[in-house]
């Protein structure tokens, strides 16, 4: 019988820490529900003690997830463990994940304790967590740089205290595959009570080894992999869920293990996370990159036409990537749009069909032909825009020449009332439009990030603008999508301002018209 590897997804905890701006609770829940459909065994969704916002998002997700175990992180500190329990207790099934650093560097420099003290703290933390649940995971942070004797000692103590999963993280992505596999093998062979717990691994990609290290660990006895969608995470990222899952599936002959992941959901979840997290996927990214199933070489194309197995070790359909259909136009009905979304694996509850169809018709009038990837972008950008936007972009025009400064005319609607202004100056039309919008709203905003990506191909491709702005010491994310770059830039700023209104309850900007 094939062994099963537990997939522990930490996109919403370790992955989210790497984002330029935090996700909203609604966006986190959307991702959590997608992860549930993907079939992850455990999803780690936050660090409840870190902020009230994190506590509430963990609690909201815990309330909604029925077919996966919901986990939350806590340091080996009573208040952390108590907060994790309070946030998780509404869940159908939950896990408390507690950790403490184990490497000499961390123990001496950060904790300023002896290793004996650290073992004692780990034991106390696991025991406290066991008061709340019989599913407790213990991690020795920076295990990759911890001596093997100390790893075995703290793992044995944690299991004796009641830990049911023991995680051996390569926190800084320091290990090479054989070295890391040897650590796991020694834990498996030297810890006398190891049969009472699952060995877990959590790898970072600083040297590009996260996937290789995780798979080598499985070959040496690990039965849980901690990973994120698209490999998002701090610094160079975490182990990529899609890479380890597909490696174990495609090379089951060699690995001899399986997961309960529904791989046909991979493409869909990957796209959702990329859009909502404002983290573009590199084109040559394994499994989910836009080039992953593209064959540009003439020899490859010839081979593919004769027999696709010549250069393709897995089919795009395995990850839920369907062949592109081209025939969506302004004459296409709602059923056609719904059908295309269904072909890509999206259920009706994933998006608002009315809003998507309205947005589709506007785009189809401009582009003529709309592709599946356009629909996908429209569905998820709309999801981010939210229902309670006070500020709406009504009209826009911008003009720029070499001889004269750029000019812009902008008309906004605030709570239904029209506001309009013109601006002259700025470094090009986008800058002029931004100056006009900021003049109208009277908000003090500093732009800290601006990114433009093409969604689709050709001159009529959609341009997606992602921005991060700073207002009163906080960062807000905005995203806009249009065939015109100036329009998508304006939509992104309006989106960010609506986020500011919701977060800070800024005074009605109509008062600024009189100043």
UniProtKB/Swiss-Prot annotation:
SUPFAM superfamilies: 2-isopropylmalate synthase LeuA, allosteric (dimerisation) domain (SSF110921), Aldolase (SSF51569). Its cofactor is Mn(2+). GO terms for molecular function: 2-isopropylmalate synthase activity; acetyl-CoA C-acetyltransferase activity; manganese ion binding. Keywords: Amino-acid biosynthesis, Branched-chain amino acid biosynthesis, Cytoplasm, Leucine biosynthesis, Manganese, Metal-binding, Transferase. It is found in: Cytoplasm. Residues 5-267 form the Pyruvate carboxyltransferase domain. Mn(2+) binds at residues 14, 202, 204, 238. One of its GO terms (biological process) is L-leucine biosynthetic process. It comes from the Bacteria. CDD domains: DRE_TIM_IPMS. Its EC number is 2.3.3.13. It is an enzyme of class 2 (transferase). Its main location: cytoplasm. GO terms for cellular component: cytosol. Belongs to the alpha-IPM synthase/homocitrate synthase family. LeuA type 1 subfamily. Catalyzes the condensation of the acetyl group of acetyl-CoA with 3-methyl-2-oxobutanoate (2-ketoisovalerate) to form 3-carboxy-3-hydroxy-4-methylpentanoate (2-isopropylmalate). This is 2-isopropylmalate synthase. The lineage of its organism: Bacteria, Pseudomonadati, Pseudomonadota, Gammaproteobacteria, Pasteurellales.
């Amino acid at each position: 019988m094939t062994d099963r590897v537990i997939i522990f997804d930490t996109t919403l905890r370790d992955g989210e820490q790497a984002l330029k701006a935090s996700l909203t609770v609604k966006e986190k829940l959307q991702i959590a529900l997608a992860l549930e459909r993907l079939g992850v065994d455990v999803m780690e969704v936050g660090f409840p003690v870190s902020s009230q916002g994190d506590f509430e998002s963990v609690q909201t997700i815990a309330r909604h997830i029925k077919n996966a175990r919901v986990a939350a992180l806590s340091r080996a500190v009573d208040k952390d463990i108590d907060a994790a329990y309070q946030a998780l207790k509404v869940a159908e099934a939950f896990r408390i994940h507690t950790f403490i650093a184990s490497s000499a560097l961390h123990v001496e420099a950060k904790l300023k304790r002896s290793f004996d003290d650290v073992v004692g703290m780990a034991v106390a933390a696991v025991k406290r967590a066991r008061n709340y649940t019989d599913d407790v995971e213990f991690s020795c942070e920076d295990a990759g740089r911890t001596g093997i004797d100390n790893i075995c000692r703290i793992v044995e103590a944690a299991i004796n205290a009641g830990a049911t999963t023991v995680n051996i993280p390569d926190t800084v992505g320091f290990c090479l595959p054989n070295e890391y596999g040897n650590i796991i093998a020694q834990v498996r062979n030297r810890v006398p009570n190891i049969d009472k717990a699952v060995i877990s691994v959590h790898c970072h990609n600083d040297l590009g080894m996260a996937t290789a290290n995780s798979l080598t660990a499985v070959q040496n006895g690990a039965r849980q992999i901690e990973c994120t969608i698209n490999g998002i995470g701090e610094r160079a990222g975490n182990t990529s869920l899609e890479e380890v899952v597909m490696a174990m599936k495609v090379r089951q002959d060699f690995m001899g293990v399986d997961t309960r992941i529904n791989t046909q959901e991979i493409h869909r979840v990957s796209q959702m996370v990329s859009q909502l997290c404002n983290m573009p996927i590199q084109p040559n990214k394994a499994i989910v990159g836009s080039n992953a199933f593209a064959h540009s070489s003439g020899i490859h194309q010839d081979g593919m036409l004769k027999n696709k197995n010549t250069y393709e070790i897995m089919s795009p359909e395995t990850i839920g990537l369907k062949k592109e259909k081209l025939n969506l136009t302004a004459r296409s009905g709602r059923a056609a749009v719904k059908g295309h979304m269904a072909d890509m694996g999206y259920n009706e509850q994933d998006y608002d069909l009315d809003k998507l169809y309205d947005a589709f018709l506007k785009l189809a009038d401009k582009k003529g032909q709309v592709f599946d990837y356009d629909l996908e972008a429209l569905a998820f950008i709309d999801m981010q825009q939210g229902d309670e936007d006070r500020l709406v972009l009504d009209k826009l025009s911008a003009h720029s020449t070499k001889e004269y400064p750029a000019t812009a005319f902008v008309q906004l609607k605030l709570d239904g009332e029209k506001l309009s202004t013109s601006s002259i100056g700025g470094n090009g039309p986008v800058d002029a439009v931004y100056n006009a919008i900021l003049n109208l709203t009277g908000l003090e905003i500093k732009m800290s990030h601006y990114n433009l990506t093409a969604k689709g191909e050709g001159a009529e491709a959609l341009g997606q603008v992602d921005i991060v702005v700073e207002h009163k010491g906080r960062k807000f994310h905005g995203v806009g999508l249009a065939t015109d770059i100036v329009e998508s830039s304006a939509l992104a700023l309006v989106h960010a301002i609506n986020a500011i209104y919701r977060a800070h309850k800024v005074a009605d900007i109509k008062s600024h018209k009189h100043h």
